[in-house]
């Protein structure tokens, strides 16, 4: 069945389907790491999570940023923890087009930067944004399974013949 990527983990976890393919970002952001089983990472495909700032911004490094708008707060916080900046940068969780956020205020707060998926950079360029440094995370498609289904040997043996290809 074809469904929105936001729903794949929930539907697999519920047992409605045995297997699904979803981005590792959805697994991480939705806290599904312990609620589904990762069968295989399809590592030939990837998409980077980047920090982007307006072209005319005075920001030179991550330590200059006060606020970041993103659909990926857990991933951004993981990165900020790794560079010891989590306490200094406020994360604002948004849904939808992050690219417009640095050009206005969100609930009265100025947004310094965004964290968003950028494969080609075209959307960033179209919105006069530039990447700040290297990607902070890289995501991949993952084949996932329902925890109960994985225990059924006949069923998983059947699926494995397709997964190996």
Please provide the spans of the model-predicted regions:
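Domain-level signature for soluble enzymes in the chorismate/prephenate branch of the shikimate pathway
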Residues: 1-165
């Amino acid at each position: 069945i074809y469904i929105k990527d936001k729903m794949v983990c929930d539907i697999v976890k519920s047992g409605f389907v045995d297997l699904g393919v979803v981005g590792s970002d959805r697994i991480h952001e939705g806290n599904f790491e312990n609620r589904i089983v990762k069968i295989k990472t399809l590592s030939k495909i990837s998409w980077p999570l980047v920090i982007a700032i307006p072209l005319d911004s005075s920001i030179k490094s991550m330590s200059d940023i006060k606020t970041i708008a993103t659909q990926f707060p857990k991933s951004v916080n993981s990165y900020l923890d790794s560079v010891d900046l989590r306490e200094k940068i406020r994360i604002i969780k948004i849904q939808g087009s992050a690219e417009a956020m640095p050009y206005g205020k969100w609930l009265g707060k100025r947004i310094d930067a965004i964290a968003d998926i950028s494969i080609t950079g075209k959307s960033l360029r179209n919105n006069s944004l530039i990447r700040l440094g290297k990607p902070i995370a890289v995501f991949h498609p993952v084949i996932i399974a329902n925890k109960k289904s994985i225990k059924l040997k006949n069923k998983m043996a059947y699926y494995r013949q397709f997964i190996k290809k």
